[in-house]
Amino acid sequence: NTCQPTQIAAIALDGRNLKLKGTFNSEIRAEVDDEKAIAAGLGPIEEGALKVTGKTREQIAKAPQLKTVWKKFTAFVDKYNWKGTPFFAPIPAGFNIIGYDMKIINRLCKEFGPWDAKRGEQQLFSKVYKIDVMDNVWMWTEGDPSIKSISMDSLRERMGMSSENAHDALQDVKDTANIMIKFMKTHRAVYRNLKIDKVFANGELYV
């Protein structure tokens, strides 16, 4: 993924009670000259993206450098690595995080660290688990023919969330977190009454 991030935002949630534990947010300087960006192997900043975020090239050019912001961001994430090892690192969660954000994170970890050279992957977040809220929502709604879209904008409208600042990175993170928490609380409530022990012991399988 060659996308140039112009903002990094994240919140940390307690894995047990799902309460807010910390917040990170910073603008990032990106290469605003399209020719220079392409020459560096990066995607140029699209005018459509600027319209969505409300940012200008001038503002982006004055933001803190990516390397500086990344160092602060990784320090923020590491605060919540309770054993200080890659396998106990925070679980990354987001909307389409597997198909989009994690690709950028892998790229930036390879460039600035932390990077696992042996495995060829990032070493900032959990190596085992990832929570993609988009996939989660799809699992809940796939059997409902009335659902035409599960985009963030559609979910905001359906769930009665404000669309103000909807494409600011921090607001996106908060909105995604609220949706995730709602579904996780539902998961937990359903699981308490779910009977799965020896459910296939009678040999009645689906396939």
Which residue stretches match the model-derived regions?
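Substrate-recognition/cap helix-loop segment adjacent to the acidic, metal-dependent catalytic center
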Residues: Y100-Y129
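A structural motif
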Residues: D144-R158
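Short, surface-exposed acidic
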Residues: R57-A61, D116-K127, S163-A169
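Alpha-helix termini
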Residues: D78-F87, G113-R119, Y191
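Acidic two-metal-ion nuclease catalytic site recognized across multiple nuclease folds
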Residues: R158, L170, K174-V207
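Conserved non-catalytic scaffold segment of RNase H-like nuclease domains
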Residues: N1-N106, S154-M161, H167
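Short alpha-helix plus adjacent loop in nuclease-associated cores
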Residues: K127-S146
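Active-site metal-coordination segments of metallo-dependent hydrolases
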Residues: T141-P145, E164-Q171
